Each structure stands twice: as C-alpha cells, then as structure tokens.
Amino acid sequence: MPNFPRTDLAVEAEAIHRSAAAVTELPGVRAEETNRRGFSVTEVHVLDAAGENALCKPTSDYYTLALDPLLRREDDAFENAAQTLAELLRRVLPLMPDASVLVVGLGNRAITPDAVGPDAIDSVMVTRHLREQLPEHFGQFRPVAALAAGVLGTTGVESADMIRALAVHLHPDAIIAVDALACAELDRLGRTVQLTDTGITPGSGVGNDRAGLSRDTLGIPVAAIGLPTVIDAGGFSDDPRAEQMFVTPRDIDTVVRDAAKLIGYGINLALHDGLTIGDVDMFLS
C-alpha cells in the first residue's frame, strides 16, 4: 500500500489519492472550486461507499476556505472571510431559528499550534445564560454555550467524555467543535479552514487519536471546524526519526491568534442572524 502523506484536509486527500491513481476523478467523489467574496472555496463531496473507499473519509461534504486575501490584509478581508465562513457553517449545520448550540474548543491552550480551539472560544458570543436571566434584552439571540475542553493530560478526563456529560445536562440541539489539524502541503499550513458535518476525532492529526465526537457518539449533529497548524516532518526528510515529528510556522502564535478570532466571529455570524462585525465587537468588548 502506498505511504500517503498525513493530512486531515479532504481537499488534500482528494488530490493525493487522485494523483496516485492517475485519474482525473475518483469514484464516488466530486470536487469543485468556487469563489465567495473574493475567497477561494474548495468543495469535496464524498457521495457514497465508493467515495469513502477512495478517499478514506466518511460520506459528507467538506469545505475548505483559503485565507489568502486575509493574509494579504486586503480591505474588508476579515469581514468577508467571517461572512464566508458563516455561510459555509450554515450549509454544514442547518439549524432551526431557536435551536441551541454548544461550541467546543478542543486542544491544549499551553501548546501554541494546538490552541486554535480554546482561543476561538474566547471570540464566541455566549448567550445561553443571558437569554435565561435577561430575556427582554437577549431573547432574540440563539442560546449558545461554550467550553474549552482541555486535554486528557491536564484534566484527567477525555474531551469526549466531558462534552458528552455536558451535552446530557444542557441538551443542545447541535455541537460545533473547533480543533487544530495537520496538513500535507505548506501552502495550506495556517492558511485554510476546513468545515464539515462528520464530527472530529481529537488528536487524530498527530496520530494521538482520542474518543471521537460525532452524531454517532453524541446523538446530535456535530459540525467540525479546523485549521491546519502542523505538517508531518516525514515529508521533508528521509530520516526515519522525522516520521515522529511535526513542524509548525515560526509565526504560529500570530497565525493561531488571527485564525481563532476569525473562526469565533464566523461562528457568531452563523448562529445569530443579522449580526455585523461591529455588533460582535461590541458584545465581546
């Protein structure tokens, strides 16, 4: 069996497997690129069992948002990126107007490349308690709770167990999980955001798989949003020791901070109709 590069991105997996098979299209897989507000969005649709076998990913739709205009600091790039991310999130997680949502940040805040999830939670508008206590002022907002779940090594509790217990108590209608991913191409490292409704397995990007979060394990829809922050060093070296190493950009602190804010704002715009970036700024200030 070929030794394919490690990646969590469906767009990379599609290209890698298609190239290895020397075909223009994989069976059961459809890929297309669109442009939204000046941002490139690649859609990979795994259609059936043939697609699952070809791509080694569950049947679903995978959206990859390229952040190039934002990284170039183009005018209105942050707002356009956040609005585009919100549109994609609404596609993977359609919700009734008053459906409640639990947003979960996965990862270890103390390790910068793994801090995307916890840092994104800092930019999420938490409204569940406000709706309950001040319905006259916050009744128009969707009930949203948030959790930075931590990691097993610092909490002694599996993230999935913690989230499952909280879900039993809160009864959310859906969960949004944010996590760091691994990619295979330098052009995508810290430069793309992937969204899907298949859920997520914490730690899978670096070969440290934990219990998964999905509709199958939690009983409700689980949307996953991920930013690739590491790349397998084995792709750059023939030294077998490199297979146990991952590399990350030297400006990863800035990359994670900016992307986490974008993801948080995109979640807010997706969950609360009619909000603007200015509204979110004011709420979080």
Predicted regions and their residues:
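Short glycine-rich or small-residue beta-strand-to-loop segments that form or flank ligand, phosphate
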Residues: 66-68, 100-111, 146-150
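Gly/Ser/Thr-rich loops at beta-strand to alpha-helix junctions
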Residues: 106-114, 153, 180-184
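A structural signal for small-residue-enriched, beta-sheet-centric alpha/beta enzyme cores
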Residues: 147-148, 161, 177-285
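A structural-propensity feature for long, helix-poor, extended segments
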Residues: 139-167
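N-terminal amphipathic/basic leader segments beginning at the initiator methionine
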Residues: 1-59
